[in-house]
Amino acid sequence: METLANRLDACQETLLELYEKDSNKLEDQIKHWAQVRLENVMLFKARECGMTRVGCTTVPALTVSKAKACQAIEVQLALQTLMQSAYSTEAWTLRDTCLEMWDAPPKKCWKKKGLSVLVKFDGSSDRDMIYTGWHHIYVQDANDDTWHKVPGKVDELGLYYEHDGVRVNYVDFGTESLTYGVTGTWEVHVAGRVIHHTSASVSSTQATASDDEPLSPIRLAVSPVPAPASAASARTGTAPPTNLLCTAPAPPSPPAKRQRVIVGQQHLRPDSTRTVGEGQVECYDKRSISNTNSTAPRWDHGDTDTVPVIHLRGDANCLKCFRYRVQKHKDKLYDRVSSTWHWAGGKCDKTAFVTVWYTSVEQRKEFLTRVNIPKGVIALPGYMSAFV
């Protein structure tokens, strides 16, 4: 016990010295990950022996120590192969060689000098996303484990780099538009420039900016797009505005799966003519649900004292995160949202609910069209009395 505590203290002391040193040498970063690996190996062994504390250090669960040790081994081996390359003399800091940088897109590559790329889906500021492009990307060859330094690029289709003449995308704007957009159009803003795109301008060869073009530190691959000049620009000789809307190409997609919405104990299938995207839920504008044993409707919501709602059922933490995420859509896509609630009494479980209140059925349909329901959460459309 005392020997293990002394060895763990020495390991942690070495880590503190490396943090204070803040070196930019690759060999120090390799040493850092070797110590992280050793620390988690000792914590793993301590937990196996039934210890919960070693000195002042709390011993985590076996799975936690094992996962961190495996991550440290992976990063250490990658840095050791990088040490044998021509880029070992470059400056490598703790930030450059951290696990988050290793796992950031493109994964299993080293990256330097990030650049923010703003994408406005549907041309709306309410649906913009910020992605990180990289000036320099260090790619390891799968055949001989050698490292190659390639420039990061961005065009109207996504963020990518080229290695051995092959384009490798690590962010596909077309795929992202299925999640964050509706119309399949977007604008790409990078370094004060807007990359223009129309579906007719997509080709297999993209014109890339040369090294001497002062566009931005990250290379832009922009297809020339003919734009009709206005009458004013024709007279003055000025170019038309460059803030154009990007239109997504129509990539081949598999047939969309028909998604079910659970209402009470009934399963309603969307109409076969409607395509429901992944993560979206179809809203049914039905004022009554017919009883299978009677021709009379079960509920009549034609009264003016009822409002459309959706009860979201699922894990409590997931519902809390979802409620926080949709706060920015308040007043536009919904009127109010409840706190997390549970049923009390009877045959109740730990299932949580969140109720979303809408001013109209159309607003509820717009909410379900634009907001992705989290996986594992079931949307239950219905009506409630307008008691407040």
From Swiss-Prot:
<dbReference type="InterPro" id="IPR001866">
    <property type="entry name" value="PPV_E2_N"/>
</dbReference>
<dbReference type="GO" id="GO:0000166">
    <property type="term" value="F:nucleotide binding"/>
</dbReference>
<keyword id="KW-0235">DNA replication</keyword>
<keyword id="KW-0805">Transcription regulation</keyword>
<feature type="region of interest" description="DNA-binding domain">
    <location>
        <begin position="306"/>
        <end position="388"/>
    </location>
</feature>
<dbReference type="Pfam" id="PF00511">
    <property type="entry name" value="PPV_E2_C"/>
</dbReference>
<keyword id="KW-0678">Repressor</keyword>
<dbReference type="GO" id="GO:0042025">
    <property type="term" value="C:host cell nucleus"/>
</dbReference>
<keyword id="KW-1048">Host nucleus</keyword>
<comment type="subunit">
    <text>Binds DNA as homodimer. Interacts with protein E1; this interaction greatly increases E1 DNA-binding activity. Interacts with protein L1; this interaction enhances E2-dependent replication and transcription activation. Interacts with protein L2; this interaction inhibits E2 transcriptional activity but not DNA replication function E2. Interacts with protein E7; this interaction inhibits E7 oncogenic activity. Interacts with host TAF1; this interaction modulates E2-dependent transcriptional regulation. Interacts with host BRD4; this interaction mediates E2 transcriptional activation function.</text>
</comment>
<keyword id="KW-0244">Early protein</keyword>
<dbReference type="InterPro" id="IPR035975">
    <property type="entry name" value="E2/EBNA1_C_sf"/>
</dbReference>
<keyword id="KW-0597">Phosphoprotein</keyword>
<keyword id="KW-0010">Activator</keyword>
<dbReference type="GO" id="GO:0006351">
    <property type="term" value="P:DNA-templated transcription"/>
</dbReference>
<dbReference type="GO" id="GO:0003677">
    <property type="term" value="F:DNA binding"/>
</dbReference>
<dbReference type="GO" id="GO:0039693">
    <property type="term" value="P:viral DNA genome replication"/>
</dbReference>
<comment type="similarity">
    <text>Belongs to the papillomaviridae E2 protein family.</text>
</comment>
<protein>
    <recommendedName>
        <fullName>Regulatory protein E2</fullName>
    </recommendedName>
</protein>
<comment type="function">
    <text>Plays a role in the initiation of viral DNA replication. A dimer of E2 interacts with a dimer of E1 in order to improve specificity of E1 DNA binding activity. Once the complex recognizes and binds DNA at specific sites, the E2 dimer is removed from DNA. E2 also regulates viral transcription through binding to the E2RE response element (5'-ACCNNNNNNGGT-3') present in multiple copies in the regulatory regions of the viral genome. Activates or represses transcription depending on E2RE's position with regards to proximal promoter elements including the TATA-box.</text>
</comment>
<keyword id="KW-0238">DNA-binding</keyword>
<dbReference type="GO" id="GO:0006275">
    <property type="term" value="P:regulation of DNA replication"/>
</dbReference>
<dbReference type="InterPro" id="IPR012677">
    <property type="entry name" value="Nucleotide-bd_a/b_plait_sf"/>
</dbReference>
<dbReference type="GO" id="GO:0003700">
    <property type="term" value="F:DNA-binding transcription factor activity"/>
</dbReference>
<keyword id="KW-0804">Transcription</keyword>
<dbReference type="InterPro" id="IPR000427">
    <property type="entry name" value="Papillomavirus_E2_C"/>
</dbReference>
<dbReference type="InterPro" id="IPR036050">
    <property type="entry name" value="Regulatory_protein_E2_N"/>
</dbReference>
<dbReference type="Pfam" id="PF00508">
    <property type="entry name" value="PPV_E2_N"/>
</dbReference>
<dbReference type="GO" id="GO:0006260">
    <property type="term" value="P:DNA replication"/>
</dbReference>
<feature type="region of interest" description="Transactivation domain">
    <location>
        <begin position="1"/>
        <end position="202"/>
    </location>
</feature>
<dbReference type="InterPro" id="IPR042503">
    <property type="entry name" value="Regulatory_protein_E2_N_1"/>
</dbReference>
<dbReference type="InterPro" id="IPR033668">
    <property type="entry name" value="Reg_prot_E2"/>
</dbReference>
<feature type="compositionally biased region" description="Polar residues">
    <location>
        <begin position="235"/>
        <end position="245"/>
    </location>
</feature>
<dbReference type="InterPro" id="IPR042504">
    <property type="entry name" value="Regulatory_protein_E2_N_2"/>
</dbReference>
<feature type="region of interest" description="Disordered">
    <location>
        <begin position="227"/>
        <end position="259"/>
    </location>
</feature>
